């Protein structure tokens, strides 16, 4: 009986760690073009999370992998250790490749949701959320974005149930 309980607990942890869903009442962008999304993005705002705690000047670089997936290189400055921290991961489409819903992993078989829910026509600004409303990033091709545009993206997030008070701004 004890072995069965441990197995069930580990299975639940595994499934919880592999959540790639989109938060309720939110849809990823359609007519998504990965080739236009590839390249460097800068984190302008985020809901803080355990894997980015204490980091600033965060950037993400996306490139194609040989297996058709996306190589993800995240980099951020730790003021505590006074050095750059880098994480390398991989991402794959959850649905069709023209929908902005991907799953991303930085650790073995564990995937999380990477859902692009707002993206400008020129692929310069992006609003990305995870599997629930505890994960949110506003990304820009440059380290800053016009304040009125940032406000538009933050209002969009707020109108979809994200707590604006939890969002850190880095510009």
Question: Language model features by range: what are they?
Answer:
Residues 1-7:
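Bacterial N-terminal signal peptides that target proteins for export
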